[in-house]
């Protein structure tokens, strides 16, 4: 089965609407994801109305989903210094594209490989990087969302 980004964006749009309308939900809905989920977090920020903030971890969407001219939500990106799947040059290009459109995109690069947050993967996991990325994520969401 192949991942369908367009369908995932439809589902994400419905999820955001549900969360905002739910009695225990809130108006400040944010999104995060890892790897493909990180790519989806950026794609959703660019294409799903109503998201308040985004925190992608080591993932980038296809260029056709990058519509930063519509974005008002800030982003905090976490990427590995050495990542064969998501090279730093591509990350920098996306960050520059976002910033050129006036989007706040804070970006950090960490030791470890693709999946540096994933403890069960000793080849990529990097404990200090994982903790720092998590601490930055919590601080970011406290500043930009109802956490």
Regions found by a protein language model. Give the residues of each.
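N-terminal cap/leader regions of alpha/beta-hydrolase-fold enzymes
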Residues: 1-147
């Amino acid at each position: 089965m192949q991942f369908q980004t367009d369908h995932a964006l439809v589902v994400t749009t419905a999820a955001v609407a549900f969360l905002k309308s739910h009695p225990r939900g809130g108006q400040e809905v944010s999104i995060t994801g890892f790897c493909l989920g990180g790519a989806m977090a950026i794609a959703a920020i660019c294409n799903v109305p109503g998201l308040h903030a985004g925190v992608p971890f080591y993932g980038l969407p296809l260029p056709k989903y990058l519509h930063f001219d519509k974005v008002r939500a800030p982003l905090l990106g976490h990427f590995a210094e050495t990542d064969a799947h998501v090279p730093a040059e591509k990350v920098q290009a996306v960050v520059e594209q976002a910033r050129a459109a006036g989007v706040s995109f804070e970006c950090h690069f960490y030791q470890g490989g693709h999946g540096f947050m994933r403890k069960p993967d000793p080849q990529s996991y990097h404990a200090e990087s994982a903790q720092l990325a998590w601490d930055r994520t919590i601080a970011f969401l406290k500043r930009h969302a109802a956490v």
